[in-house]
A protein has these predicted regions:
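Short, acidic, small-residue-rich periplasmic hinge/interaction motif at the N-terminus
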Residues: 31-33, 41-46, 75-79, 89, ...
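Acidic/polar loop-and-plug regions of large Gram-negative outer-membrane beta-barrel proteins
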Residues: 283, 287, 299-369, 382-413, ...
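Structural signature of Gram-negative outer-membrane beta-barrels, strongest in the C-terminal barrel
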Residues: 308, 413, 432-434, 440-444, ...
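C-terminal beta-signal and adjacent terminal beta-strands/loops
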Residues: 642, 702-712, 733-783
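Outer-membrane beta-barrel translocator/receptor signature
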Residues: 209-211, 222-299, 307-311, 360, ...
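Short acidic/polar hinge/loop motifs at secondary-structure boundaries
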Residues: 170, 178-179, 195-217, 235-238
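Gram-negative outer-membrane beta-barrel transporters
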Residues: 624-712, 778-782
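Membrane-embedded beta-barrel scaffold of Gram-negative outer-membrane proteins
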Residues: 367-381, 385-391, 580-643, 647-659
């Protein structure tokens, strides 16, 4: 642990004489009359275009305000507006506090109008630890709001979430988890700021419990201990708001889809010190493939104890149950090529035993404001993923006949996470130091058993071009022995990590210029029966610079690192060094029309060194000569362009290539599983007055080209490219009073949409085909 002392060299003093300027800033908090933080409150200077909205802690910040006297106004739907005079002095910060009273009549009668909070968010969630507005953060962070998820009728992470962020694609389409690729590699999965990534997990969060989803592009030392340099996505679950309200919804759709949700939000004590949130969901869902289904139940209660105005404790329990068809059922197989079978082709039989998942987690979050400038937060979490089931895969092809095999697929994943961090501001003359310091710890145990199984015996031949179902007797399937606990019969993978992080965001020149100096020291330990124990440690620096050209436009640059421990050793017995990923990024961010819509442009280059490649002199061994380089351009736009028209639009160009290998034969090859061009758009227009008041119309398109399959990329006898992908969707909705109805149509033009590859080990193709045109009709009621 002597390397911990390396952190003492991370920060250094900066002496900079800043020119005198006649501007100051205003910061403050907004709470309700029962002392709860008020989120999404609009705070603005009357008679000007300068304003902001509060974050989840009720805090706000206005910068670059000309010195003088103003009237500061705070307003929000369901709260009585309040104003107060404020004096802004040059080179000083004015602190203001508001207490707003609930307007019961407005909450009861008002129909919430589209506003900048519906598609646009000013601040990251508390779980990302950053107090800095997104506009000023030197990193590409995109936030998908709950309203977007509702408009698109998304049920879980599998269903089109990635269309709302530039450059994201899915590499696998299993029903249990979302494997998302961005900037050339898989991104990590976070929930409420905690890394919950597993080899085949986590279970996808149902959107009924989700408040927002944050995509953080590139390495993020303030969150990631170790992992791919592509970034991560953070699912933020719903928390109590302090308002008493509820919402119910029912959905019916194609393929026998039936779904209901309930969302209750309110107070358990009259003084408002004990709050609750309860989300319930039940779902029966088939697919376009015969005998395939995914039925789910989720129960998510949250309790928040406001111990005093500065201290709170939040307890959240999540339970998700899934009963589904065997894993692997979503794939099609052919000896001839991709896509030469009908989209509804299935290898399933109607009498196959289901796979079940019980997913539970418990999270405790303690928050204490030491004073107006400093805050301490800690999180403890326990997650348990228990899967009992089987998988269905091809054994081989004999002509056009597919020989199918079933095997046990039991999993137990137990994750324990602890996080402790402190945020605060220190002012030294003309400089403000925004400090973030934290400790992350985690222990992940993962057991799997797929060692039992075999061919489906006694079955009649299964011709993929003329399949006949229902001919397999129950006795033909393998019988699995589960008499031993999976901890005894399964293969164990264990990952442990601990990391210290320290960051100083130095704000100068009236806080127009912001320099971030940070570093993380991480130790990891990985163990499995194949590679034994692999320990690694690494110090990763982070340097960022952001400058506000105007109050609504900033430019930034950032350098950050990530590392990935590697098991094994060379022929000489030398252990492999971790993969190191370096990210260099520059960008531009803008807010328009007082934050009603935002746009960002980012250019980056990620270089991964120490990648393993084959040893030319020793067969079956590897050496560390490999390198990949991914560079690209990302554009994101979201918000209300004109009154009533909310959009989410993005484009990404990704150029990922192998730049070094053993003999150079694969240099210049596109990184498997990447798409060169991805473009998405979603437009939602709502009429707010006139004969069509309450009517909403939506239209969306997803397109990607230059696609490369995961397998076969290094087999020169096979073309690894996949066909272009273009899908059109549309929706119509109507809101009348407290009730709303929405009809969504997906894949309007019945496009054949595929993702798959050639499997070189068995000489056949596998792919997944999306459904042709399908519908969802949803009704919701607020009370």
């Amino acid at each position: 642990m002597k390397h911990l002392y390396a952190l003492s060299f991370l920060m250094w003093l900066i002496t900079l004489g800043s020119a005198s300027a006649q501007t100051g800033r205003i910061t403050g908090t907004v709470v309700t009359n029962d002392h709860q933080p008020a989120e999404f409150v609009n705070v603005y200077l009357k008679g000007t275009t300068q304003g902001a909205s509060t974050d989840a802690e009720g805090t706000f910040e206005l910068q670059d305000i000309q010195a003088g006297s103003y009237t500061l106004v705070a307003s929000s739907v369901g709260l009585k507006s309040v104003s107060q005079p404020v004096e802004v002095r040059a080179n000083q910060t004015t602190t203001v506090s508001f207490t707003l009273e609930v307007d019961g009549k407005e909450l009861e009668e008002i129909v919430v109008r589209a506003n900048p909070s519906l598609y646009v968010t000013d601040y990251p969630s508390i779980s990302l630890r950053l107090k800095t507005p997104l506009l000023e953060t030197p990193q590409n962070i995109q936030v998908i709001s709950n309203q977007v998820l509702k408009d698109q009728q998304i049920f879980d992470m599998q269903e089109g979430v990635i269309r709302n962020v530039s450059g994201a694609t899915r590499s696998e389409h299993w029903e249990t988890y979302a494997r998302i690729v961005m900037r050339g590699s898989r991104v990590a999965s976070f929930r409420n700021g905690m890394n919950v990534t597993e080899t085949w997990g986590p279970l996808t969060e149902d959107m009924s419990m989700v408040e927002r989803i944050e995509f953080v592009k590139g390495p993020a030392g303030f969150m990631l201990a170790s992992g791919e340099p592509s970034g991560f996505y953070n699912v933020v679950t719903k928390k109590p708001t302090g308002f008493t309200k509820a919402e119910a919804s029912m959905t019916v759709g194609s393929f026998g889809t039936y779904r209901s949700t309930l969302d209750f939000d309110g107070k358990l004590s009259k003084d408002g010190k004990v709050l609750y949130r309860l989300n319930l969901m039940g779902q029966l869902k088939g697919t376009h493939r015969a005998y395939e289904y995914n039925n789910r139940v989720s129960v998510v209660p949250v309790l928040k104890f406001q111990i005093n105005p500065r201290t709170s404790l939040t307890a959240e329990y999540t339970y998700q149950y899934v009963q589904m068809s065997p894993i692997g059922s979503s794939y099609s197989y052919s000896p001839n090529g991709l896509g030469d079978l009908p989209v509804n082709f299935s290898t399933l039989e109607p009498n196959m035993r289901p796979t079940t998942v019980n997913d539970q987690s418990l999270t405790l979050t303690f928050s204490h404001s030491l004073n107006d400038d400093w805050k301490f937060t800690s999180q403890l979490a326990y997650l348990n993923f228990d899967q009992v089931g089987q998988s269905l895969w091809p054994s081989s092809f004999v002509g056009d006949t597919l020989l199918r095999a079933a095997s046990i697929w039991d999993i137990l994943g137990v994750t324990k996470v602890g996080q402790f961090f402190v945020n605060g501001d220190v002012r030294t003359g003309a400089l403000t130091h925004r400090i973030l310091a934290g400790l992350d710890m985690g222990d992940k145990d993962y057991y799997h058993d797929w060692a039992q199984g075999g061919a489906i015996t006694g079955a009649s031949s299964f011709n993929v071009f003329n399949p006949v179902y229902g001919q397999v007797p129950a006795s033909a399937y393998p019988v699995y022995d589960r008499s031993l606990d999976i901890r005894e019969r399964g293969v164990r993978y264990n990952n442990q990590y601990a990391a210290l992080y320290l960051q100083d965001e130095i704000r100068m020149l009236d806080e127009k210029l912001r320099l971030t100096l940070a570093g993380r020291y991480t130790t990891t330990g990985d163990a499995d029966p194949y590679s034994g124990q692999v320990d690694a440690e690494k110090f990763t620096p982070r340097v960022g610079l952001s400058y506000s050209l105007t109050p609504s436009m900033s430019v930034y640059g950032v350098y950050d690192q990530a590392f990935i421990p590697q098991a094994g050793a060379s022929f000489e017995g030398t252990p492999f060094d971790p993969i190191v990923g370096d990210n260099k990024e520059v960008g531009l961010k803008t807010d328009w029309l007082n934050g009603r819509w935002t746009a960002s442009l980012a250019a980056y280059q990620i270089t991964k060194n120490n990648v393993l490649t084959s040893d030319p002199e020793h067969q079956y061994f590897s050496i560390q000569l490999g390198q990949t380089k991914t560079q690209g351009l990302e554009i994101d736009l979201r918000g209300e362009l004109v009154e009533g028209l909310n959009v989410t639009m993005n484009y990404a160009y990704t150029d990922g290539k192998v730049t070094k290998d053993t003999d150079g034969s694969f240099q210049g090859t596109q990184i498997p599983g990447t798409d060169k061009h991805i473009a998405n758009a979603w437009l939602h227009y709502k009429f707010w007055q006139g004969a069509f008041e309450g009517l909403g119309l939506s239209f969306g398109v997803q397109h990607s080209s230059g696609r490369t399959a995961w397998y076969g990329a290094y087999d020169r006898t096979v073309d690894p490219s996949m066909p272009d992908y273009t899908r059109f969707d549309a929706a119509v909705s109507y809101q009348f009073g407290k009730m709303g109805v929405s009809l969504n149509a997906n894949n309007l033009f019945n496009a054949q949409l595929l993702s798959g590859a050639y499997y070189p080990y068995s000489n056949f193709y596998y792919w997944q085909a999306e459904a042709l045109r399908n519908y969802r009709l949803s009704m919701n009621y607020r009370f």
